[in-house]
Design a protein with these regions (language model features):
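A short beta-strand element within beta-rich, extracytoplasmic domains
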Residues: 259-283
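Active-site-adjacent mobile loop/cap segments within catalytic or ligand-binding domains
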Residues: 348-356, 427, 442-471, 501-567, ...
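Helical hinge/lid and interdomain linker segments adjacent to catalytic or ligand-binding clefts
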Residues: 716-848
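Pro/Thr/Ser/Gly-rich low-complexity, intrinsically disordered linker/stalk tracts
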Residues: 562-605, 654-672
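Non-catalytic propeptide/linker segments at domain boundaries
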Residues: 50-150, 341, 346-375, 379, ...
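Beta-strand-rich modules
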Residues: 635-654
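A glycine-rich, often tryptophan-bearing local segment used as a flexible ligand/cofactor-contacting loop or short
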Residues: 793-901, 918, 957, 961
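Short beta-strand-plus-loop segments that form exposed binding edges in beta-rich domains
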Residues: 331-343
């Protein structure tokens, strides 16, 4: 060291450390800072501070870095104001984080898009044409040491990471990205339908419902190998995509005599199925092969760039199909192309997800003398790890099993990153590498982490990238681009969680480390560890569907910001779903649909600029019928079918998730009209408790409510003692859970129960309109009859409840509206599991609120609470009363988890508030507790039942109960009660 350059220890380092520590962001947990050295060069007028890695593990921008440098100079307590300060975090000069700009990041340069849905999402300011590779952590895999299939993580807090991350990616994140115009590829099965049908000309175990017609050009065999389902079970080395033939035809221009290939799968049952196509990519393949999908939704067309993606399964979407058979085309391929001299190729089609068909066996290290056999997983394919999907999808075994079939665990995590390069190889993103020529913009590995606290502390969000200390990707992009992607996504996640759920949410480090899924992809890549699945405080939020929606939206926004900034263009975020939806009769044959846009307080660009109206007639499928610029639509009705509607908000960034479903039915001028009000908007985690040393989820009382469905629930929690540690994945400690539902899909809130109620109302001869509870509460019309759907609505808090509660059964505005209508003579049918408990046994309400709630229930609806959790068998029956309309009814409502209807664990029991006005009309079968009451209040009549009407499993039973209710209203409408006394005399009401 020269006299002009010296390094200080002890006190100076401590002062600098103290200064840097003071600038750590709030709720950050990147690890402890450490100052290794402080060197001052007076000749160069430079201060160099070398710190440990943690100093570079947080988000750094020009302002924060300037503040850090300023604090260093202040800590030196000398005249160094004109000195340059350089701060190192490990090997990284923090200035280098700012030297990489977005204009140095190279995006794809391909002329033609990969997959183009005709009449699809219009998102010029979204992710239109971008290709994203993404996967949801681990999956069910074969462990040769134990000669069994198992999860890669422990069963804990009613889920397992291998399934848990899917509950973000499949129902939320993938659709959001697709709604923004992106094409998303996954190395795991994305269809939860356990039926799977393969149609292929090569036969074998495939259906052979494949047909060709030749027009100007004739079909012939291509010179390359293709798919054949020659083995029902795949073993080591098997690749179905080199076992068969590919068909080929020269392309013609649109309007010429076309040649057509059709695939007509015989599906075992009606339902939603994913459709995958396959083909070969040849030197002269068409960039715009035209596929048509015929489904219950109509005909949808796609242009597929066959120059990319040959020799694997290419996803086109999910579609609703009838149970179909030979001769009814489902997928069609025409040989039209805009490119002269191009060829079209055709190979197998896959419909549905199915069960795993890759068998594994112990190859090395087994017990001597045992002749190990191949073993299948026997699990749905969507639960399996990526390694097995890749084999089924024709990926070379050099990618999916670098261990040569010895170690599936390491193969799986190594294969996922290598798969990205296999997709991108040969494209502008990864030239000079053999692959599928698909220009992948970025990749995301979505994981959750381990780690636990004994209190209410959040573990929080960790993100990992790899910069190779300033290295570059194959296309010249600086690897620091991954840090920019990581920062964008992590910032959005943490900011949105703090703004909506938990202001103390921890932002952990942005690690620059050589994790395979962050290091291997030759495109900007992020490995996300969202939260700790082992920490109860994290999972109070993590099991909540609305939290999952928010996080998924944050990730989508982070990707959008990164790609838009890379491309130097403005971006627009897709809107949130609309609110306050209502359908009202305008005049004969005309109905007004109205709604309101939902403001995204975190994103100013997310307001809708137009709306898409979709209609479903009867029990058909939704189809687009209108595009409107204002928040209303006039539906013209000339029949007595049930017409259901949903609204999709849209802007230049894409489209929102659909709204709740409302419906109408017009039975003619003489029919009375029922207004159905959807007050069941709840989606939530299971009930939980925290009693210090014991805590956990109590789904025996309430499993929570999934959004549409849940694919992450494995079974109830069994270990509630906080001090029980993890010892093995088979002995997970605190939070350990059962496994009896881990292959099942669990039904949730479909937001489509107006239709279920409406079917029974229409069967009784009544017309109906419908409304969301919000719109209804603010309306001023005077309906004759109200049918209020409350399902499993109840007041809850998410996590610590910092931002208040939601989903109360009867908010004040709704109470006021119903009270006003009652005075005006509106009759009311109310059904729900918490119609009384939420107003009496509610720890989130003050005494004053409870008093007001109970007064409303007694005076307006005519009941008082007896008990919650009133039935477990799910059976109820009518009892004799002075209201003779209710007789001979027996009802079975859903009390078990299943894939078609949400479960009712805790139905309510209550009794008439006034025996002179009300009567018991229904009891639960196993204990004779009251399950329903009817009241004739003089001004209005009410019927209230303690379980949701829509969960009655038999349609005829639903029809019977609805007709009995409507007959009761009709017979008492004039104020003359058809009331039977104990001696069968009839009294008039005054």
């Amino acid at each position: 060291m020269t006299m002009s350059s010296f390094s200080w220890a002890s006190t100076v380092k401590e002062d600098v450390l103290c200064a840097l520590d003071s600038l750590q962001p709030a709720q950050a947990n990147v690890g402890a800072y450490k100052v290794e050295s402080v060197t001052i060069n007076k000749n160069k007028k430079e201060v160099v501070v070398k710190c440990n890695d943690m100093v570079g593990y947080h988000s750094v921008d020009s302002l924060s870095l300037a503040e850090m440098k300023k604090s260093v100079l202040a800590a030196l307590k000398g005249d160094y104001s004109d000195y340059k300060v350089t701060i190192y975090g490990g090997k990284h000069n923090l200035d280098n984080f700012l030297t990489v700009s977005y204009d140095q990041i190279c995006g794809p340069t391909e002329k033609h898009r990969f997959i183009t849905p005709i009449d699809g999402v219009e998102a010029p300011s979204g992710l239109d044409g971008n290709n994203i590779a993404m996967w949801q952590s681990h999956g069910w895999y074969f462990e040769p040491k134990l000669n069994r299939w198992e999860w890669q993580r422990a069963r804990i807090f009613e889920t397992v990471e291998d399934l848990y991350t899917q509950s973000y990616v499949l129902p939320f994140l993938m659709p959001m990205l697709e709604n923004a115009g992106a094409y998303v590829m996954s190395p795991r099965e994305r269809d939860i339908n356990t039926n799977e049908v393969i149609v292929d000309q090569d036969g074998g175990f495939a259906q052979e419902f494949y047909k060709e017609t030749s027009g100007k050009e004739s079909w012939s065999d291509a010179s390359v190998k293709g798919f054949a389902y020659s083995k029902a079970v795949l073993e080591n080395g098997d690749n179905p995509f080199v076992e068969g033939k590919v068909r080929m035809v020269n392309a013609v221009k649109a309007g010429e005599n076309v040649s057509v290939a059709t695939w007509s799968p015989e599906l075992p049952q009606a339902g939603k199925y994913a459709v995958y196509v396959s083909y070969a990519s040849l030197p002269n393949s068409a960039p715009d092969a035209l596929y048509r999908i015929y489904s219950r939704e109509g005909v949808k067309e796609f242009k597929v760039n066959q120059q990319m993606g040959g020799g694997t399964w290419i996803y086109l979407g999910h579609f609703a199909f009838d149970k179909s058979g030979e001769g009814k085309p489902v997928i069609e391929l025409q040989n039209t192309s805009s490119v002269e001299g191009a060829v079209i190729t055709a190979d197998a089609v896959k419909v549905g997800g199915g069960y795993g068909n890759v068998a594994r066996k112990v190859k090395e290290g087994g017990e001597p003398g045992i002749n190990y056999e191949y073993v299948k997983s026997e699990y749905p394919r969507f639960t399996e790890a990526a390694r097995y999907w890749m084999q089924w999808a024709g990926v070379p075994d050099s990618i999916y099993t670098p261990s040569n079939n010895v170690n599936d665990y390491t193969d799986d995590y190594k294969a996922r990153g290598a798969w990205v390069n296999y997709l991108a190889g040969g494209s502008s993103m990864l030239p000079n590498y053999k692959g599928l020529n698909i220009p992948i913009d970025l990749s995301l590995a979505f994981h959750t982490d381990a780690g636990t606290t004994m209190n209410d502390s959040i573990i929080g969000t960790l993100s990992i990238y790899y910069s190779d200390n300033g290295g570059k990707y194959a296309n010249g992009t600086p690897r620091y681009a991954s840090r920019m992607l990581t920062d964008s996504i992590a910032t959005n996640i943490v900011d949105d969680i703090r703004a909506s759920y938990e202001p103390r949410w921890t932002r952990r480090a942005m690690w620059d480390k050589t994790y395979y899924e962050a290091r291997v992809p030759q495109v900007p890549a992020l490995l996300l560890e969202l939260l700790s699945h082992q920490n109860f405080a994290d999972m109070k939020y993590g099991l909540d569907p609305s939290f999952r929606f928010t996080v998924s939206r944050s990730i989508y926004k982070g990707m959008l910001e990164f790609i838009a900034n890379r491309d130097n263009r403005p971006y627009v975020v897709q809107p949130l779903p609309i609110n306050s939806f209502a359908i009202n009769k305008k005049e004969e044959g005309k109905y007004r649909l109205s709604w309101q846009a939902t403001e995204d307080k975190q994103e100013s660009t997310a307001m809708p600029s137009y709306y898409i109206v979709e209609e479903r007639i009867g029990n058909g499928e939704f189809k687009k019928i209108a595009k409107v610029d204002v928040a209303e639509y006039i539906a013209e009705i000339s029949d007595d079918n049930i017409h259901s509607y949903r609204i999709i908000a849209a802007n230049a960034g894409g489209v929102s998730f659909p709204s709740e479903v409302l419906a109408l039915c017009d039975k003619g001028k003489d029919a009375k009209t029922v207004t159905i009000v959807n007050g069941f908007t709840r989606v939530s985690a299971p009930d939980w408790f925290d009693a210090g040393d014991i805590a956990g989820f109590n789904d025996r009382k309430d499993h929570g409510v999934p959004y549409l469905y849940d694919i992450s629930y494995i079974g109830e929690q069994t270990e509630f003692r906080r001090n029980i540690p993890w010892m093995d994945d088979d002995a997970a400690g605190f939070g350990a859970s059962r496994a009896n539902y881990e292959t099942k899909v669990i039904a949730g809130n479909t937001f489509d129960y107006v239709y279920s109620h409406g079917v029974s109302i229409a069967e009784a001869g009544y017309s109906f309109v419908s409304s969301s509870a919000d719109a209804f509460s603010n309306a001023t019309d005077k309906p004759e009859i109200v049918d209020l759907i409350l399902g499993k609505q109840k007041e809850i808090k998410v996590g610590t409840g910092t931002y208040g509660t939601k989903y109360k059964t009867f908010p004040t505005a709704l109470q006021n509206r119903l009270r006003t209508l009652a005075k005006g003579g509106t009759d009311m049918f109310v059904s729900g599991a918490y119609v009384a408990t939420d107003l009496w046994d509610n720890a989130m309400s003050s005494k004053a609120t409870l008093d007001a709630d109970q007064k409303f229930a007694a005076e307006v609806l005519g009941y008082k609470w007896r008990t919650g959790q009133a039935s477990i068998t799910g059976e109820a029956y009518h009892v004799q009363s002075r209201f003779s309309e209710f007789n001979n009814g027996k009802y079975r409502f859903n009390n078990e988890l299943n894939d078609t209807c949400y479960v009712v664990e805790s139905p309510d029991s209550f009794y008439p508030a006034d025996d002179k006005k009300g009567a018991t009309i229904m009891r639960y079968a196993e204990n004779n507790l009251i399950g329903g009451i009817a009241s004739d209040n003089g001004t209005h009549q009410t019927v209230v039942i303690g379980f949701p009407f829509e969960t009655i499993t038999d349609q005829s039973q639903r029809n019977h109960l609805m007709k009995s209710t409507l007959d009761f209203f009709k017979n008492h409408a004039s104020g003359k009660a058809n009331v039977k006394s104990s001696n069968t005399t009839t009294k008039k009401k005054k």
